[in-house]
From Swiss-Prot:
InterPro entries: CinA, CinA-like_C, CinA_C, CinA_KH, Competence-induced_CinA, MoaB/Mog-like_dom_sf, MoaB/Mog_dom. This is CinA-like protein. It holds the Pfam family MoCF_biosynth. It comes from the Bacteria. It comes from Citrifermentans bemidjiense (strain ATCC BAA-1014 / DSM 16622 / JCM 12645 / Bem). Belongs to the CinA family. Coiled coil: none annotated.
Amino acid sequence: MRVAVLSIGDELLSGEVVDTNASHIADRLFQAGGRVERHLTVPDDAEAIASALTELGARSDAVIVTGGLGPTPDDLTAEAAARAAGTELELSSEALDHLERFAQRITGELHPANRRQALLPKGCRLIPNPLGTALGFVVRIGQADCFFMPGVPYEMERMLEETVLPELTGRFEAGWQRVTLKLFGIAEAAIAELLEGAIPEGSPVQLAYCVKFPEIHLILRATASDAPFLQQAAGELRQRLSAYLFAEDREEMDDRLALLLRESGLTLALAESCTGGMIAARITAVAGSSAYFLEGNVTYSNEAKTRMLQVPAPLIAEHGAVSAEVARAMAVGAREAAGSDLALSVTGIAGPDGGTPEKPVGTVYLALVDQGSCRVERFNFQGDRDRVRSITCFTALDWLRRYLLTRKTTPGRG
C-alpha cells in the first residue's frame, strides 16, 4: 500500500514551526506495518494544496493530510480538497453540531468565525475530534483515500490513533518491522568500521544511520517475513557495539538510568554549574524518580559553591571554579548535604566567553563520589554553548549509567 503525507502551512516552510506531525505519522505507520513513500509540504495556498492533492492522489493509495482546518482566512484545506475531488463545499450539519457543543463546553457560545469549519467537501466522511473544534474528513481524490486532520499535534495524534490507523492497518500487504539501537560516545566512521561485514551482502535487512546529537541511532528494517534475519542482524550489532549501546527502540537514556538506579537501591544527589539543572531535569523526567533522586543544587556562582556545598573559597581561588579539585569538592559537598549514596557534580566553561589557553571553552570536569571513592575526569567538548551544555548533560548521564553497570557486574558490590 502506497501512503503519502501532505503537510500544509506557511509556518512549516518558513522554519518557524518544526513539522513533528509528519514524523509522528511515519513512525506510527511503520509500527503498524506500513510505510510512508512520499512526503510533501505546501504553503497555505488553495491552488498549491489542490495541486499537491491531485498529484499525490494519482500516485498513492492513501494520503494523510494535516493542517489548514482552522477558522482563520488562511485555513484553505477544505476548499482545496473540494476542488481536487471535483466537488464543492457544503455546510455539514454534523460538523456544525460538533462545533456548537464544543463551544458550549468551553466558552458557552460559538464564535461566528468558527462556522466556516463546518464547510466541508460535499459527500465527505467525518473523522471525530474529541479534543478540538476542527473535525477531520475523508474524501476520494484520484485513486487515493485522503484523510484530513488538523495540524494541532495532540488533536491529530488522537484522531490518527482512533480513526485513521485502524482503517489503514488492515490494508498493509507486508508489514514492516524495525530495531533501533541507540549509541553514544562513538563517531559514525568508527561505527562503520566496527560493522564491516556484519550484515551480509544480499541481506533483506536495511541499515540506516540517524544522528540525533549527541546520540547516533542505527535503524534496522525488514519486512515481517524477514523477521529472523532482522533479529540475527540486531544481535550481531549489539555484540559489536556493546561498549556504546545504551538503549533500544523507544527506551531513552533517562529510562535506562532510572531502571539501573532502582535496581541498585542507591540514592543520588547532584551539583551542577554549567548545565544549570539540565541533568536534574532529565533524571526527574521519569516518573517515580523520587525513589532514588534526593536533591539537586545549581551552584552557578563561586559564592553558591561555598555556601551550599562547602567548597572552600581558597580552593576555588587556587585552582579555579573549573577544575578537578573543585568538581571533587562539589560532589563531596552534595553527597554530605543530601545524605545520599552517590553524588555527581559538573563544572565547566560552556562559552562563548570565559575560556583560556589552559582551559578553553568546552572544558568540563565531572566528578562522581560514592561511599569509598571519588572519580574525576576532564572533557574537552566542541561546539557552541548549547552543544557543550547538551553533550555535558548526556555525558554525565552516561557516566552514571556506566558506573551503575560496573557496580552491578562487580562481585561483592550491589
